[in-house]
Amino acid sequence: MSMRLPAALGATAATWLVTACLQAPLALAQTPPAAPAVAITDQDISDAYIYLLGRLLVTRQQQLDFKDGMQWNTLYHRKPGAVDWPNPNLDVAYSEAWVGIDEKSCTQVTVPKVVDRYYTVQFLNGWGETLANINEREYPEHPNGEFAVCLKDAKVSLPADTQRIDVPARTLRVLSRVELGKDWSEAERLQHQFKMRPSGSPQLPEVPKTLIFEGQKLPGVEAFDSATVALQEPDINPGMEQVQAKVRAIAAAIADPAERARVDKSIHTQAFADIAKASPIIGHGTARDGWARPATVGTYGDDYLTRTLVNYGGIWANTQKEVIYYRGGQDANGKTLDGTQSYSLTFPGKQLPASMANYYWSITATNAKTFLVLPNSLNRFSVNDQADLKYNQDGSLTLHFAPSKPQDVADGNWLPTAPGQIYRLVLRFYGPKGDVASGEYFPPVIKHL
């Protein structure tokens, strides 16, 4: 780039500028010494760790899925009722896939006609962000038939009757959900009619090889050893550059053994403490009467704290337009729920859970540390609108949570708990409406009996 002096300055001004440069002291002409590196604070470490952890939870699950035999662009239909992952939704038939797309190949999806039953096909990116749902709510003019999920701006020729959906990611996690309802066999029949196939021959991505840590045991400084690989997946949310820069700076700094030890200590003190502090309200959520409701789920914007907590406690959560979750962990006295004790939860007749869901509601009890369902001899892990519920004379509904069925309580109103286990309740509203959808509703207090 050339730089020209304005003509109005004339030769005198030009001569003055040149002379001034030539007469500058030698010290000014030399390159100044580099500024000292900015110290990485404990808060920097905590922010970077929480951000990175959200991605590592996804890559851990991806590696485990492929280790278990999953293949790219293949939809796997799971047997209903499986409970071997955190916070399972026991009211749907799941199908799962990992999808790879590129500029020349989309993923084609066949959706059967589903009547009077909840269903959706959810697509998430490598950070746990929901990019799309296929259902009659999102596509009322094309609720079933042929769909194609394509990389944005991909040049792909598709059949005329295909609904194209553009997404900003090459790697996608897919979950298809079909409500079980009263007729599980019909739900399974519909589940197996969902199909998936690539439109061409996509260049499949490599499964990222990042740290795999056990269960809910969080890693320490070793998380940053996977930073370079983890950050290769674009984060679609704006404003993440600063925290990503922190992640990269820490990943470089821990090459020094002393700094590595300091970062590890900081993670185990401040980062873990920050996570523990945020967990009761699920990040930036709201707590009331022993229940917590997250501020956002499924799509997170700049709220990476909530994203990480959701990925940790119930990965692949959908958007609040589809489902709203409440987590109950304390009784009316502020004490944690104990599987040895007995509790009750009464919904007033004018606020029955069925009145606040377009599709269905359910409540599940899970271990407070592992997030797995509580084992019991009945293999009963949830209560929902399909249970044989008995209502009180005033129209209210009382549910009971206890290791053995309380006297004079209908069997359908009782959810068994496990003695000695601290647990939480997860209340789901699918197709939320009314005060649940607006955020004004909170469940009643849980009473210790």
Where are these regions (language model features)?
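Selective for proline/serine-rich intrinsically disordered segments
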Residues: 4, 23, 30-34
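Bacterial N-terminal signal peptides that target proteins for export
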Residues: 1-16
